[in-house]
Structures are given as C-alpha cells and as structure tokens.
Amino acid sequence: MTDRLASLFESAVSMLPMSEARSLDLFTEITNYDESACDAWIGRIRCGDTDRVTLFRAWYSRRNFGQLSGSVQISMSTLNARIAIGGLYGDITYPVTSPLAITMGFAACEAAQGNYADAMEALEAAPVAGSEHLVAWMKAVVYGAAERWTDVIDQVKSAGKWPDKFLAGAAGVAHGVAAANLALFTEAERRLTEANDSPAGEACARAIAWYLAMARRSQGNESAAVALLEWLQTTHPEPKVAAALKDPSYRLKTTTAEQIASRADPWDPGSVVTDNSGRERLLAEAQAELDRQIGLTRVKNQIERYRAATLMARVRAAKGMKVAQPSKHMIFTGPPGTGKTTIARVVANILAGLGVIAEPKLVETSRKDFVAEYEGQSAVKTAKTIDQALGGVLFIDEAYALVQERDGRTDPFGQEALDTLLARMENDRDRLVVIIAGYSSDIDRLLETNEGLRSRFATRIEFDTYSPEELLEIANVIAAADDSALTAEAAENFLQAAKQLEQRMLRGRRALDVAGNGRYARQLVEASEQCRDMRLAQVLDIDTLDEDRLREINGSDMAEAIAAVHAHLNMRE
C-alpha cells in the first residue's frame, strides 16, 4: 500500500499544472487512507484546502514530512505550497518546505481562532537553529491576535538584525500596530511610515493604512487620516472603515502596559482586573493633599465642585441618563509659588480615582517641550510630548510662553505647537486632560492668539497671592519637616519681611509674587537654617548642644537670611 500511496502522490504532483481539482482529489484519497501522510496534507494546502482541520493534520503529522515525496524523489518545494502567517499585520505567506513552516501556519490559524496557548505551545517546541527570527515573528502574530502589544514589541524589537528583510519589514508593521494600540501615536506613525517603504509594504498595505489613519487622526491630522480611509474604503472596504469615515470622532480603542499586565487571564483582553481599592486610595490621597494646603480657600472650593461634577457625570452615565460633556481641561491662573503644580497633582489623583484617566500621571512641561527651532518640527515635538501624557494630565507651566511676541510679529513655531496642542486636546479629550498655568493677564493674552483655545477650557481657577500670615504658617510647616523651629522673634522678622514685600511693586508686579510666594517662604527657612548652623558651628564644644538648640532658628538667623535672600532676588531697598 505504501507504494500505491507514493504513486498517487507522484500523480497528484504531476497534475498540479493542469488540474488542481484532480490533484486535490488524489491528495485527499491519500489522507483518507493515511492521516499521517504529512506530504499529502501539504498537497491539499497547495490546492487551496486551508481548513483548520487540514492545517492541524499537517502539523500533527509533521514528523513524517518528506517521506512520500522522498520515496518518489520529488522535492517538496516542487509543490509550491504556501501558508498564511501574517495574522492581522498583512497578507503574508510562507513556503511550506519544512516542519517549521507547517508549525508557523498552524500557529497562525490557531491564533486566529483564539487558541493562543495552543499556538504558543506549538511554537515553543519548534525552534530550529538559524530560524529564531521565524519563531519570533510568529509569536508576534499570536501576541497581536491576543492584543498583548507589549509582548509584540518585545518579539520584534531586534528585527533589524533578521536575515529575512521581508519579515524584518513586516516586523516594523507589527511594531507600529502595537505602538498605535498603546496610544504611542508618534512612534506608530514613524514605524508604519518606514515599514510602508520596506519589502513588506505592499503585503501589509491594509494594516499600515488603517493604523496610520488612526494615528494621524489622534494627532489632529484629519485630512491625512481621511485620505487613507478613503483609499481603504475603495480597495479594502469593511464596516470599521466606513464607520471611521462617517464619524470623525471614531478612535482606536487603546490600552496600556499596566492594563495588559493586570489581566486575570493573560490571553483574554476582557479580563483586566479593576482594583477599586486603588482608586479609593487615590481619592483619599488627593483629599489629604488638598487638606494640607494652607489657605487656598477659593481653590479648594472650586476643586471640590470640579470633583463633584465629574463624579455625578459618571454616575448618571452609568445609569444611562443624559450627561453634559463639558471639557475637563483647566486653566490655573495666579502668581508663582501659590500651589498650582501641587493642585495639578491633586487633580490627576482625583481624575484617576474617578476612572476618568487611566493613571495619576502628571507630565510637567514648558515651552521647550513643544517648540522646535525649525519649521514643521514643532508639531512633531508637541505630538511626542502629548503622547507621553496620554492617559494622564499634561501640565503646561507659564503656558503664555508657548506663543511669544516678536516685535509685533507672530511666532510661527509657537503657533504651530499651539495649533497641534489644540487639535489633540479635542481629538484625545477622552484620554488627556490639559492644565495651562500662568499669570492671569498673560494667560488671557495666550487665549487671544487662537479663536478656539478659550472654548477648550471649561474650568478656570484663580490662585491668590498668599498673605504674610499664610506664608508664615507655610514656613513653620517647612521648618518642622526639617526638625527646625522658628522662635517668636524669628517669626516676627519673617512676618515683617513678607509684609514689606506685600506692599512693594517690583518690575510691574507685587514684590511678593516676584519673590515666589511659597518658594520665598522655603528660601527663607533654608537660608535661616544655614545661618543657624554657621552660628552653632562656632560653639567650642559642639557635643554639648541639645536638640532644642539644634532645632532653634532665632531672630538673628532669620534677619541674616532675609538680607541674603532679598539680595539674591534683587529686592533690597
């Protein structure tokens, strides 16, 4: 019977150029008799039979690869059988000329069916020296099907060294797709654009166009996104493309490395474990930090209203009720040193605690993080900065410096950055909260530079200058944290110095604001501690100093510190 099967195999191969249907019948006759005839299963694959059972049988009998063909002295490459290994990345096939190739096709099929663990188990048993890149590629296919994007990147990050330049190009697509799904849109755009020019560009054109469109839309480049979507709708129409064309707010559903790592079942994207205790902790920390702030009564009240409105909106939405959708972006105005950055951290904790943003992340930035030196580069630089803040809060201190006045001329680089920021604030409004901060008059000037900017901010919080008494209270807190204490005389000297600055104007602003308010209090405490230490260092027997004397900042220490700090700040009379 073995001779008969070999003869049937030889006949089936010879019929391939003339009648694939007849060849398929002969290959099927062989497998009906002997399910372990691996070569015949591959013949069926060559004839278009890529059923899951066929792929499984070919893989299950892979140890018999080459037996039938060898018995009639036919090379398996003669069949020209190819198997799909592209997964969601592209229409990629691979020649079935080895047991490893069979395993690759089987793994791709199982991953598409959701049998990720089986696919990975088959690949783990398959490594062949010199073919590690093939296994790495297939693992990226399996991980991609399971939406384990961080693992995809791990598998393809060394693809530049792969000997197969086609698969190396496809790996660039996989890297770009993973980056897009992790909301790293600038990186996704770079990877996908490079991959489009690689040998795999044509085979992966569909995936490249879709994810590049989603990346560009999220970056505010709607016209480029629409152009790609229209090409897809013409060449590869499908419901999601039509939906994205119809609705400009259509976005890629992204995730984070933390969410992937928190899955109860690593292969199930829906098994992300929500730890509400963590959210409750964030809310408690936010409230505690808010309570610790000295003064800021109006600010605290506004933050409480912001928190209440956000909470109730989520409660109403959960019950299917209509919810107003005011912008969550905020403006903080006031002089330096009045707690704006601290309150921004409080807001980040509140929003993360309420589940509005993914994590209590505050990315602190200024003009240098947005504005480049060459035309066209500010948009790229701004996009990268915004990508870092996705899922959290982007805090822009001295935001008025984004667009600078140049002898009455516009600042093209700053305007480019601002336009990009404005688009992303709208496009990423569900994943990004922007807080801009600075002096009230300067922020108003910034808002006038773009018609749509003011409307992006629904909440504006004014930070008042601290009173001298509040600054003294802050100074006492700072000192206590350093195991120091102000004597009554030191406190009085501090208070009088602060009152003098409160009454003075310097460079068109209140001197206390120029000094930095809370920062001024910290500078005086730190300088007075240095003066105290210098004084105590003159004691003949240092070992006799008790804790009270080591802790005490006296009137002369504070007076000397005031003179030094005022000189440094150029505030002397």
UniProtKB/Swiss-Prot annotation:
Phenotype for K340A: Does not affect substrate-binding, but decreases the catalytic efficiency and the Vmax
GO biological process, one term: biological process involved in interaction with host
Keyword terms of this UniProt record: ATP-binding, Cytoplasm, Nucleotide-binding
Organism: Mycobacterium tuberculosis (strain ATCC 25618 / H37Rv)
Localisation per UniProt entry: Cytoplasm
Role of this protein: Part of the ESX-1 specialized secretion system, which delivers several virulence factors to host cells during infection, including the key virulence factors EsxA (ESAT-6) and EsxB (CFP-10). EccA1 exhibits ATPase activity and may provide energy for the export of ESX-1 substrates.
Family: Belongs to the CbxX/CfxQ family.
Disruption of the gene: reported phenotype: Disruption abolishes EsxA and EsxB secretion, but not their expression. It results in a lack of antigen specific immunogenicity and leads to attenuated virulence.
InterPro entries given in the database record: AAA+_ATPase, AAA_lid_6, ATPase_AAA_core, CbxX/CfxQ, CbxX/CfxQ_RuBisCO_ESX, P-loop_NTPase, T7SS_EccA, T7SS_EccA1-like_N
NCBIfam families documented for this protein: T7SS_EccA
Binding locations of ATP: G334, P335, P336, G337, T338, G339, K340, T341
Protein name: ESX-1 secretion system protein EccA1
